């Protein structure tokens, strides 16, 4: 017996795939989140991007999320994702997309540069947390929730914003943003924002 495919479901899958491709999703993510065939996804990708999808495996190491800058970006994305999920505004891949759009709004990339946290990596992060490989831990200094390895001791964790590595401080001194160089300017900007 042949199962008949729903035209409406196929249209929804095509729309979802187009949105994911526009945000930079890799083929493996498209295959996982839609019911479209690999051939149709490749054809759609080529039509939208003008080139075939990149080849290669998905990132599978949790270590990428632990380096200081990647951790800050990943934590920002995941907190937005968690808020959307808990508030019941959306779920599943829709929550990933909305949280990723919020992340891009808050962390705009320089012209010609890709965002530090790619959509596929953000999607992988959600899967790592769901599978118990990563978790959110509260910083004992600022109270912010940050991505850490699972089973991290709950007390004593200090985030990389409160305790940046020395290379972050060196990079900050080279920044063209005055608020990055002169801490008092940053404090004033924070007070005005509050």
From Swiss-Prot:
Its cofactor is Zn(2+). Coiled coil: none annotated. Binds 1 zinc ion per subunit. One of its GO terms (molecular function) is zinc ion binding. It is found in: Cytoplasm. Zn(2+) binds at residues 139, 142, 159, 162. Belongs to the FlhC family. Functions in complex with FlhD as a master transcriptional regulator that regulates transcription of several flagellar and non-flagellar operons by binding to their promoter region. Activates expression of class 2 flagellar genes, including fliA, which is a flagellum-specific sigma factor that turns on the class 3 genes. Also regulates genes whose products function in a variety of physiological pathways. Heterohexamer composed of two FlhC and four FlhD subunits. Each FlhC binds a FlhD dimer, forming a heterotrimer, and a hexamer assembles by dimerization of two heterotrimers. This is Flagellar transcriptional regulator FlhC. One of its GO terms (cellular component) is cytoplasm. Keywords: Activator, Bacterial flagellum biogenesis, Cytoplasm, DNA-binding, Metal-binding, Transcription, Transcription regulation, Zinc. Its main location: cytoplasm. It holds the Pfam family FlhC. The keyword Zinc applies. GO terms for biological process: bacterial-type flagellum organization; positive regulation of DNA-templated transcription; regulation of bacterial-type flagellum assembly. InterPro entries: FlhC.
